[in-house]
Regions:
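Peripheral, non-AAA+ core regions of ATP-driven protein-machinery
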Residues: 1-137
Length: 137
């Protein structure tokens, strides 16, 4: 996940990670399994470098491809429920994980295809524009 994040920061979000001393710490007591933290890691680094606070009522999940796509992940329903219990008002998820049942939940679900969409939803109130380099596959 971290390698993909560094590539996406450089190619699609105009940040060259080599220009910064980036240290990621995943505490040993926190279980981390699979690639679903890719989007969150990218937003964390982006917001730190840009000095932008992320609303703590927004949760997000999704695998990040090297081409900037937000890929589907497993366990989406329990992740949304955990975010809701933790106080999230909005959860950003991969579009491929969307289910119509989400319309009935008491939490706002935003389904996205690309990392630029995630950034726009997270930093939109600040009026920041990101470059969009869409690649056809």
């Amino acid at each position: 996940s971290v390698d993909n994040v560094m590539t996406v920061l450089r190619k699609y979000l105009n940040i060259d990670p080599r220009d910064y001393d980036i240290h990621l710490n995943f505490p040993g007591g926190i279980p981390i399994d699979g690639p679903s933290a890719g989007v969150t890691i990218a937003v964390s680094i982006y917001s730190s470098i840009k000095g932008i606070l992320v609303d703590n009522h927004i949760a997000m999940t999704g695998e990040l491809s090297v081409r900037g796509y937000v890929k589907p992940i497993g366990g989406i329903v329990p992740k949304i429920e955990a975010a809701r219990r933790a106080g999230a008002k909005t959860v950003i998820i991969p579009k491929e994980n969307w289910q119509d049942i989400f319309k009935t939940l008491d939490i706002n679900i935003i389904a996205v295809d690309r990392i630029e969409e995630v950034i726009e939803h997270v930093v939109h109130p600040y009026g920041i524009n990101v470059r969009t380099n869409t690649v056809s596959v």
